[in-house]
């Protein structure tokens, strides 16, 4: 299994970096993991819809450079499908069994994802109807991927 996380923006807080390093280590027992950070665009105060669209398209261009053609793409979106941890584990396991051993998760920046990225998504995943900082979402996603592998392998952790 190969998992790639493409995320817009850099992690600046040490406590988040520490959690990312820890979960990356834990996941490495089960899967190859690549985390790719693409630069985010500086967002002006109160941007217009046109400005937002232009910023999102610039970020999308950066994301697309790293997207592999054969990868199953999962975007994190507020309007995506909410899953339980067990359902996410089943999704990852089912993809692996069906021969889709390369999964790419995409986390947008503060403005979200461009429509172009959303349209190429094979699965839109939502962690909540609430909005979270995109840097924190990386930690939450890594924790859920790790939890998924523990569930798939029947190992204790997910209770």
From Swiss-Prot:
EC numbers, comma separated: 2.1.1.177
Residues reported to bind S-adenosyl-L-methionine: 76, 108, 127-132
A GO CC annotation given for this chain: cytoplasm
Main location: cytoplasm
Cell location: Cytoplasm
Catalysed reaction, written as an equation: pseudouridine(1915) in 23S rRNA + S-adenosyl-L-methionine = N(3)-methylpseudouridine(1915) in 23S rRNA + S-adenosyl-L-homocysteine + H(+)
Main EC class the enzyme belongs to: transferase
Keyword field: Cytoplasm, Methyltransferase, rRNA processing, S-adenosyl-L-methionine, Transferase
MF (Gene Ontology): rRNA (pseudouridine-N3-)-methyltransferase activity
Function according to Swiss-Prot or TrEMBL: Specifically methylates the pseudouridine at position 1915 (m3Psi1915) in 23S rRNA.
Family: Belongs to the RNA methyltransferase RlmH family.
Protein name in UniProt: Putative ribosomal RNA large subunit methyltransferase H
UniProt organism field: Methanococcus maripaludis (strain C6 / ATCC BAA-1332)
Lineage, top ranks: Archaea, Methanobacteriati, Methanobacteriota, Methanomada group, Methanococci
